Curated annotation (Swiss-Prot):
It comes from Picea sitchensis (Sitka spruce). Residues 1-13, 77-85, 157-180 are cytoplasmic. Its main location: membrane. InterPro entries: CASP/CASPL, CASP_dom. This is CASP-like protein 2A3.
Amino acid sequence: MELIYGSTMRKKWIEPALRFLPVGLCISALALMLKSKEGNENGILEYKHVGAFRYLAYANGICAAYSVLSTFNSVVPRSCSLSRAWFVFVFDQAFTYLMLGAGAVVTEVLYLAYKGDEKITWFEICPYYGRFCNRVAASLVISFLALLCFIPLSLISAYRVFSKYDPPSLCKKDQITSQS
């Protein structure tokens, strides 16, 4: 935490930068996903035909909006009350897990699209829809880059919340048994 709280200059720009960077990343991933459409003699494949891809698109849109709001919240000087710290902590955790969950689901579906699974008669589709798969894969990679911004933000907000509490007292085993 020295990197975050050591220098005043570092403290002033690291968190807002980590909060603003996902805006561009999430919007880029969202735009790529929305443009993912390809047709051939087998039919037309769009992102909206696959629930996991819609989930990632929605997650990127929601996280971009949250990043804008949280960036504004981090640059406007306010007192760091316990309730505000908890609010930021809960939302940082929620959006980090939203991105993680969406990325994990799309990773699995994309793996099946590339490799298939003959045991359950799920055949690979990426040889037939290569451009579509490449765009979805690029959107997924960009989403994971946004996740790499959300993870340290979750750690920073967790540190802010839990540093406001006293550590638990350490008791010896004899003290515990004598109190019972």
